[in-house]
Amino acid sequence: MIAKGSEPWLFTAASVTALFAILSRATDGLPFLNYIANVGMALTFVMVIFFRDPERKVETSDTYMISPADGTVIDIRDRKICIFMFLQNVHVNRAPISGKISEIIYKKGGYLPAFCKDSERNERNEFIIHSKYGDVRVTQIAGIIARRIVTYSNVNDTVEQGQRIGMIRFGSRVDVTIPHDFDITVEKGERVLAGKTIIATIKNDRDF
């Protein structure tokens, strides 16, 4: 399955590749055109891999939160987990908890490497999900290559845990806040999968 919002990129890459392939064939394999066509085929293939959106069986529960993104935990501070998505990771983001989207805040910004401290000033999109345990903030932060954050959900939408809520094109980062009713269960440097990895569990003394 290909991620929603990736169609323009794939169509452009495939169209340009096809054009150069036709020109190369029409000119009896002119080396320069043949080279461009081969590079285009390789880039199109890489994009197909990058924009993949595999189906995942999500086990939902009120007793834990799941990762909103594929990638590696690069920081944990002030009850916020920061996940860096490398180019080879799936870049579709999912709701870490069930609830209602009360607000979506988009901010323009720069395009510094998403793992840098200064990336706090990068382009970003913040979902505020109102859950039974309070507000959970999921922040998509664009990276050095990314130029547009794609949003799948809208304000007042009710989302289920693990539901797709958006995507960031190319290298990027996702931050998620953890309510005080939960204990964080991941560590810095740990690899996580969106919709699969448990990142926090309900405290034992919490009454349902």
Swiss-Prot record:
<comment type="similarity">
    <text>Belongs to the phosphatidylserine decarboxylase family. PSD-A subfamily.</text>
</comment>
<keyword id="KW-1003">Cell membrane</keyword>
<keyword id="KW-1208">Phospholipid metabolism</keyword>
<keyword id="KW-0472">Membrane</keyword>
<feature type="active site" description="Schiff-base intermediate with substrate; via pyruvic acid">
    <location>
        <position position="172"/>
    </location>
</feature>
<keyword id="KW-0444">Lipid biosynthesis</keyword>
<keyword id="KW-0210">Decarboxylase</keyword>
<keyword id="KW-0594">Phospholipid biosynthesis</keyword>
<feature type="site" description="Cleavage (non-hydrolytic); by autocatalysis">
    <location>
        <begin position="171"/>
        <end position="172"/>
    </location>
</feature>
<comment type="function">
    <text>Catalyzes the formation of archaetidylethanolamine (PtdEtn) from archaetidylserine (PtdSer).</text>
</comment>
<keyword id="KW-0670">Pyruvate</keyword>
<dbReference type="InterPro" id="IPR033175">
    <property type="entry name" value="PSD-A"/>
</dbReference>
<keyword id="KW-0443">Lipid metabolism</keyword>
<keyword id="KW-0456">Lyase</keyword>
<feature type="modified residue" description="Pyruvic acid (Ser); by autocatalysis">
    <location>
        <position position="172"/>
    </location>
</feature>
<dbReference type="GO" id="GO:0004609">
    <property type="term" value="F:phosphatidylserine decarboxylase activity"/>
</dbReference>
<dbReference type="Pfam" id="PF02666">
    <property type="entry name" value="PS_Dcarbxylase"/>
</dbReference>
<protein>
    <recommendedName>
        <fullName>Putative archaetidylserine decarboxylase proenzyme</fullName>
        <ecNumber>4.1.1.-</ecNumber>
    </recommendedName>
</protein>
<dbReference type="GO" id="GO:0008654">
    <property type="term" value="P:phospholipid biosynthetic process"/>
</dbReference>
<dbReference type="GO" id="GO:0005886">
    <property type="term" value="C:plasma membrane"/>
</dbReference>
<comment type="subunit">
    <text>Heterodimer of a large membrane-associated beta subunit and a small pyruvoyl-containing alpha subunit.</text>
</comment>
<dbReference type="InterPro" id="IPR003817">
    <property type="entry name" value="PS_Dcarbxylase"/>
</dbReference>
<keyword id="KW-0865">Zymogen</keyword>
